[in-house]
Amino acid sequence: MQKLWEGRFSEASSALLEEFNASINFDKKLYKDDIEGSIAHSSMLANCGILSKDEVDKIKNGLNQILNEIESGNFEFKISDEDIHMAIEKRLAEIIGKNTAGRLHTARSRNDQVATDFRHFCMRENLAIAELLRTFVKALVEIAEKNIQTLMPGFTHLQHAQPISLAEHLLAYAFMFKRDFERFISSYERNNFSPLGSAALAGTPHMIDRFETAETLGFKAPMSNSMDGVSDRDFALEILFNISVVFTHTSRLCEELILWNSQEFGFITISDAFSTGSSIMPQKKNPDVAELIRGKTGRIYGNLISLLTTMKGLALAYNKDMQEDKECVFDSVKEVHTSVVILREMLKTAKFNEKNMLKACKKGHLTATDLADYLVREKNIPFRKAHFIVGKCVATAESLGLDLSEMSLENLQKIDGEIDENALKCLDLFNSKNSRKSYGGTADESVRVQIEILKKWLKK
């Protein structure tokens, strides 16, 4: 099979080389970006007087025919074509003739063509993933709004710590995913510049208009340095990093859902639609969705490390190593789309078991800090002394087989006479939760403020 670059060569390519060198099996995903880039490039060449109107019309018609062939499944992808860019150019030559098709590549190298296609793909995905995260935040806010007064134990070190609102817990994730959204938007704003026209590395002697192609393709402007345009993949690293952070957050949430779904916790029941069974144990109902997302996180991290390692030792400008930039991005992009959607839908159909959460709040002395704060605030006792007093109260409660909230005033006063009837109010779980009215706290009114913040953001 004739190569578009074979003029300098006297021998045909080895079949081993063709198989090893080809990227068409995965970079064919960029077909639409490549065709859009070529149409924009040909229009610009015509506007600059480099191509005639007739030539451009033939090129555009041919490219649109190729687009239809690919999308209808009638385009034959061949390893011998090496990559999607060469495959499209070769097919274009078959449709409109070699001479006219060959003029499309005027003032363009595969280096800037590839960089443009890939950057265009990543910019589009930055926006698509951001929108996906927005819908996830919306779902979390809706669930939280229904559970402002649902009490559950808050944890540190996976030990019972303080009583909190389930809404507060879910909103913590909502704010994390909000920041994830902002990272993708920030990456889009920072990287939405066009490499097209950088050519191989040093620009081109043809009098082209890079600003025109940048605008046509939705970029803010052309990249200011042609070597930078073809050499770097920081935009790809950023989308991989951003997706890795999303998976850090989804993995943490999934870990909690797995725990909460267990018989030991019983805080949540995942619907049958998002659970699986066992091949041998008839009673099993497994949280496989959450486990898979948690498991996929390692692969997502690996994709980021893979590209970081690929790029770290490359001299400017383009190197073939950079062909390894795409599979990791395509994989991470696919996984973030599927994982966020299924996690969102699983949460929307899950049932939170309020009785079990409340029951759990009556274990672990969740209001101990409230009693210490009361002694500091109302009795002017230094916090370290108050901490010691309440520690004694907890030890006594445990020796009696009670939770601190179940201790009588008589037993508490035996430990320290400063503890009075008003102190008992601090031991009430709901009083404890609603006393934490500081900005961002778990009191009902503070949680409603958080919900309003997110609702206003969602409307923007």
Curated annotation (Swiss-Prot):
Family annotation (PROSITE patterns): FUMARATE_LYASES
GO cellular component: cytosol
Catalytic activity: 2-(N(omega)-L-arginino)succinate = fumarate + L-arginine
Main location group: cytoplasm
UniProt KW keywords: Amino-acid biosynthesis, Arginine biosynthesis, Cytoplasm, Lyase
Pathway assigned in UniProt: Amino-acid biosynthesis; L-arginine biosynthesis; L-arginine from L-ornithine and carbamoyl phosphate: step 3/3
GO biological process terms held by the UniProt record: arginine biosynthetic process via ornithine; L-arginine biosynthetic process
Localization of this protein: Cytoplasm
Protein name per the record: Argininosuccinate lyase
Organism, as annotated: Campylobacter hominis (strain ATCC BAA-381 / DSM 21671 / CCUG 45161 / LMG 19568 / NCTC 13146 / CH001A)
Gene assigned in the entry: argH
